[in-house]
Amino acid sequence: MWEVSKKENLDRKLIEVCRHFRIPGEYQFCEEIKVGNVNKTYKVTFEGEDPKNPGNMRLKSYIVQSVNTFAFKNPVQVMDNIDKVTEYIHAKDPGRCALHYHHTADRKTYIFDKSGFWRLFNFIPSVTYSATENLQVIRNAGLAFGNFQMLLSDFDASQLHETIPDFHNTIKRYEQMEEQIAIDPVDRVKEVRAEIDWLESVKEQACKLTQLQLDGVLPLRVTHNDTKINNVLFDKDTDEALVVIDLDTVMPGLVGHDFGDAVRFAANFVEEDSLETEKAGVNMEIFRAFAEGFLSKTAKSLTQPELDTLALSCLALTCELATRFLADYIAGDVYFKTNYDEHNLVRARCQIALAKDMLKKMPQMESVIQDCVKKL
């Protein structure tokens, strides 16, 4: 009985949210989409008249999300960034499949009430991949993120809010780790001396991207900042990339942040928390496939310093995440969700192993990028 009541309350709330966004027709049903662990996501379906066939009825679906305001402290700024970026992309390429966030009567892309922070956008029939070794899918993912970057290459990134300050400021991430080392709140530093020493030994290389940005060598651009392959929707029949999703972290950043984090996630031989750290490393076939797709769309709009530091960006983003995992382990596991006592340490060691392999393969990675650019 309680479950029925809970379902009825959810249905009522979703109908209320949809009416705020002026969704026509009669509510039919909803289903929770349990992908991602930050926001609550629902697919809602309405029945209404088909505008292309007057007199005929059709079912149309939408995505409704309840945004996690603990994770996103300034959700209004998040939505302002998303609205600006999605409208700009649509204006530049109106015929392309795109995310469209619906507006309320007072032109807001959200409603904020006692039940939470809600938004609604179009449902796009598609498939996603959490991980794959299919090189065409990887290439298409690179193309999708590259196209996202290309369409926004002339957008003034200063118009966007920095919703997560210093998110990819590797210098600050190192400082945060070093602060935890100095405090050593739960007496774990002695366990991780080897990891600390190695990360400190590559600090200058890892922080070079951030330093070049501070020196004015690398320009700030609109960046996605969560370029995992599962943030691309693919055509279920052809594996063509349709659109980049999950724009909550869109803000000013470096193009290398998006490229490097995508490679870090997709091209590792193992999962980022694998216990088999000896198997961690860069799959060069996947690296090449992603680079081919990404650069086919971006090479002509990137500066030479940006192109020259793309391979380095992979090392920078990997070391950055390693410092975050290690800092959290030293702090007593207060930030990242863990499944067992040494989970953050395992994560840090896996990223360090990946970074070590990146250092060995840096000449190969740089050569691949140069080859991709030459072929255009």
Language-model features, listed with the residues they occupy:
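ATP-dependent phospho-/nucleotidyl transfer catalytic cores
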Residues: 24, 31-35, 73-76, 127-139, ...
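Short secondary-structure junctions
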Residues: 19-27, 91-97, 300-301
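Long, compositionally biased intrinsically disordered regions
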Residues: 358-362
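Active-site acidic catalytic loop and adjacent metal/ATP-binding pocket
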Residues: 37-46, 51-52, 56-59, 63-64, ...
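ATP-binding pocket architecture of kinase catalytic cores
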Residues: 49-53, 57-159, 182
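Active-site activation/catalytic loop segments of kinase-like enzymes and analogous catalytic loops
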Residues: 252, 256-300, 316-335
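Hydrophobic alpha-helical bundle architecture
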Residues: 122, 293-314
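Juxta-kinase regulatory segment immediately upstream of eukaryotic protein kinase catalytic domains
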Residues: 1-31
